[in-house]
Amino acid sequence: MSGASTFPGYRLRFAEPEDSKALVPLINVAFLPEQEAIEGARINEEKLRPFLSSGTFVVLEDGQGLAGCVYAEIRGKRGYIGLLAVRPELQGRGLGRLLMARAEEFLSGAGCEAAELRTVSARSSLVPMYEHLGYQVTGTSKMPAEVPLKIPCHYIMMSKQLT
């Protein structure tokens, strides 16, 4: 996988099954700001399993282990991107942008014409970041009833043409 050479000391690759134990804490620490709106940890190994069987994770490694990840799933001509996570001390360095580019490259290579994602309205500060990457807001949707909300919020749906 190309691209990590622009970030010396990092290596991009697709996740292996043994990465699941490292993905859970990485995602949870990156999603800590969400806990102002949603009760509990973002993910556990049980909740991670369906992601691993339905799609793939692009992971970014450094000398300390996983530095970041993003989930990509092929859904016909439209791909889905989610669970973008970068260790907090590494955020703001362009690593999320690198991960998103590789996820989009994967989806495009699989024949997807567009990529879709969603973010929680309580983290609306993420919308400009995704817009900077070429995504546009396409609408909103309700949070599933089983999501333990602390405050009212919803999903902000976004999409980007890949071809």
For the regions a protein language model found, what residue spans apply to each?
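Hydrophobic alpha-helical segments
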Residues: 30-33, 58, 82, 96, ...
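Acetyl-CoA-dependent GNAT
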Residues: 8-10, 14-20, 24-89, 100-102, ...
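C-terminal "cap" of GNAT-fold acetyltransferases
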Residues: 49, 57-58, 113-127, 131-163
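Conserved glycine-rich acetyl-CoA-binding loop
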Residues: 65, 87-101, 110, 121-128, ...
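Residues at secondary-structure transition points
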Residues: 18, 38-39, 43, 94, ...
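Short acidic N-proximal helix/loop "leader" segments that mark the beginning
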Residues: 1-6
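Long amphipathic alpha-helical scaffold regions
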Residues: 106-109, 116
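Glycine-centered loop/turn positions within well-structured domains
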Residues: 79, 93, 156
